[in-house]
Amino acid sequence: MVPMDRLLQIVRRFEFLEARLSAGAAPAEIAALSREYAELKPVVAEIAAYRTALEDLAEAEAMLADPEMRALAEDELPRLRARIPEMEQALRLALLPRDAADARPAILEIRPGTGGEEAALFAGDLLRMYQRYAEAQGWRFELLDLAPSELGGIREATARIEGEGAFARLKYESGVHRVQRVPETEAQGRIHTSAATVAVLPEAEEVDIAIPAADIRIDTMRSSGAGGQHVNTTDSAVRITHLPTGIVVTSSEKSQHRNREIAMQVLRARLYDLERQRLAEARSADRKAQVGSGDRSERIRTYNFPQGRMTDHRINLTLYALPQIMAGDLAEVIAALTAHDQAARLAEMEA
């Protein structure tokens, strides 16, 4: 049974927010009020449906005392009683504490790991996979930085993805992605194993992370493309080093001013993510074992091209739909990861 007093508190809070927004809240408050209102709206809809189901059940049980209505009530009661546990479970999931970063845009970073040029090619495949997934969701996909490799792969890529639920859905992608396939350069037809690392970070605002000027060193350098060829004749590329943590961020677009903006944007996201991980570990020693822990060194997934198979090792999910997945069809994978994470958090909350 879900505590009714807690549900009523949520409804009252929602009604308060609705009244404030209708009355014309102060401009400085509108964004925060609107965000909270949007978060509570689906929860309040679940509460309304649950209360209606309880009322229908009570009405049917009362009908048992009426000889003329008893047969009808006996027909309806099994269905009505079966609905209550399902709706209570849906409510418990809706009431799970939300990750404050879920509504933010996502910063996506992809780097090849072991495997040389084949790893760089696979990193490029992953970048295209996420771009197609983002486009299918109607999200905005902005490539912030791209360093191509010799044979058309990538040495490093950074992108910003903005849209409803972008970080909430993509945050489970952080970790090591392993590929097993025959490289195009392999004359003997042997299967090679290589890997790429994916990091998905919530975008951070300046108000979230203050970076004193004394904490960073900014270096400029010559922009270069594939094979080390100079893209232009000015020192436009920017490398920013965060001295307290040693984090290094680079951006090599043609505009030095834009490169500074991009590098600071990515640096803020990384520092914000570090703080989020620190707080998560402080809240729960078991959090590392959950799907959304974001451990960058964890091998999370294998893409086996000869078998057309993708396996997510965290939840033992195997799908024989690799061409569709590489084309951006990640819906089933992300839904399974989300459900697993929700179940783990629900168990932790109720323990």
From Swiss-Prot:
Highest taxon in the source lineage: Bacteria
Record PTM N5-methylglutamine, positions in chain: Q229
PROSITE patterns attached to this UniProt entry: RF_PROK_I
Organism this protein belongs to: Cereibacter sphaeroides (strain ATCC 17025 / ATH 2.4.3) (Rhodobacter sphaeroides)
Main location: cytoplasm
Post-translational modification: Methylated by PrmC. Methylation increases the termination efficiency of RF1.
Reported function: Peptide chain release factor 1 directs the termination of translation in response to the peptide chain termination codons UAG and UAA.
NCBIfam families: prfA, PRK00591.1
Family: Belongs to the prokaryotic/mitochondrial release factor family.
MF annotations from Gene Ontology: translation release factor activity, codon specific
Record's keyword annotation contains Nuclease: no
PANTHER family named in the record: LD18447P
Protein known as: Peptide chain release factor 1
Keywords noted in UniProt: Cytoplasm, Methylation, Protein biosynthesis
UniProt cross-references to InterPro entries, sorted A to Z: PCRF, Pep_chain_release_fac_I, Pep_chain_release_fac_I_sf, Prokaryotic/Mito_RF, RF-1
Location(s) in or outside the cell: Cytoplasm
UniProt GO cellular component terms: cytoplasm
Keyword Chloroplast: no
